[in-house]
């Protein structure tokens, strides 16, 4: 990001947030009181939604042998609304219940990266895994289950936390960077290198953002190898199609962009809106969450299918290193088009 240190010299870091860390660059200092409030929000967020914390509400649902009724905080409502929309728009390919598949494939709380022996018989909704649409009954921010359900809110959870933190900033200009997922409010464009998934020291393009959210997904960020036999290993990553429970193929990286009206940042919100059911409202109020979710969805759904529900700009890189992008994607791209 060009000259960011000069334009936004005040940096606040949350090194352990969501496992990837978060960094806020701003044109004015973030005071101790604001930083403390942000730290409290991050702690509450993980205590509720992280499947990697044994004491989280999400982990409790996964251990409830007979299910139950689980009350989430009001600030979860827009996140659940977004998952409703993504589940519908992708015909179930994006589903929080994919947590069970991730665990069977080795992406569990202990990071064992060891596939369970029974995984082939149980992966995906096609083989009977629980689904958001059927096995999790939602009443606002209350989720009702009839047995243990392993939920994972990683598809858009990081972006949603970025949005909530952005609502707490009084700065005129800021950039929130959560492991490459960005929320930007600036007076002049910020230039951002689009990382090459094959070599993090290279870029396949440069985006230019003034106000908006730009989020990326790539298997290269989180993958592991599993031995089939003494001679053969297969690569597994965390971007799964929830229908069959298998890692998505053919796409190497994706980027999704949601623009923001500058007025969006001029209002101070300490908590999430309790109702944001309409998809345009979700995108307007939680652009990073939507961009995060769509960057994941681009691995498992056709663009045209997603565009029936969401208005967004995108770019994708396929296995042949050809890039496809919408005309309104705000970037210079260095590779040939698909």
Which residues make up each language-model segment?
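Mature catalytic core of soluble alpha/beta enzymes
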Residues: 1-338
């Amino acid at each position: 990001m060009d000259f960011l240190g000069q334009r936004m010299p005040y940096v606040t870091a949350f090194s352990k947030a969501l496992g990837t860390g978060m960094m806020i660059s701003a044109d004015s200092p973030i005071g101790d009181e604001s930083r403390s409030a942000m730290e409290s929000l991050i702690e509450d967020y993980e205590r509720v939604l992280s499947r990697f914390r044994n004491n989280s509400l999400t982990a409790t649902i996964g251990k409830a042998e007979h299910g139950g009724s689980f009350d989430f905080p009001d600030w979860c409502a827009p996140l659940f609304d977004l998952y409703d929309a993504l589940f519908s728009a992708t015909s179930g390919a994006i589903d929080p219940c994919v947590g069970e598949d991730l665990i069977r494939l080795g992406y569990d709380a202990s990071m064992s990266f060891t596939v369970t022996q029974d995984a082939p018989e149980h992966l995906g909704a096609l083989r009977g895994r629980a689904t958001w649409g059927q096995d999790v009954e939602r009443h606002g921010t209350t989720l009702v289950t009839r047995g243990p359900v392993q939920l994972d809110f990683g598809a858009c959870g990081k972006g949603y936390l970025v949005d909530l933190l952005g609502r707490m900033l009084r700065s005129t200009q800021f950039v929130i960077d959560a492991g490459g997922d960005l929320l930007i409010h600036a007076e002049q464009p910020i230039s951002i290198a689009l990382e090459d998934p094959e070599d993090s020291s290279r870029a396949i393009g440069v985006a230019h953002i003034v106000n908006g959210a730009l989020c990326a997904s790539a298997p290269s960020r989180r993958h592991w190898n599993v031995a089939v036999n003494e001679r053969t290993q297969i690569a597994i990553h965390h971007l799964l199609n929830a229908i069959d429970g298998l890692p998505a193929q053919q796409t190497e990286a994706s980027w999704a962009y949601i623009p923001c009206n500058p007025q969006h940042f001029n209002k101070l919100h300490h908590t999430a809106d309790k109702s944001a059911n309409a998809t345009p409202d979700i995108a307007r109020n939680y652009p990073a969450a939507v961009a995060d979710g769509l960057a994941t969805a681009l691995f498992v759904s056709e663009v045209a299918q997603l565009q029936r529900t969401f208005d967004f700009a995108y770019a994708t890189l396929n296995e042949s290193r050809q890039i496809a992008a919408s005309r309104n994607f705000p970037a210079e791209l260095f590779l040939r088009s698909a």
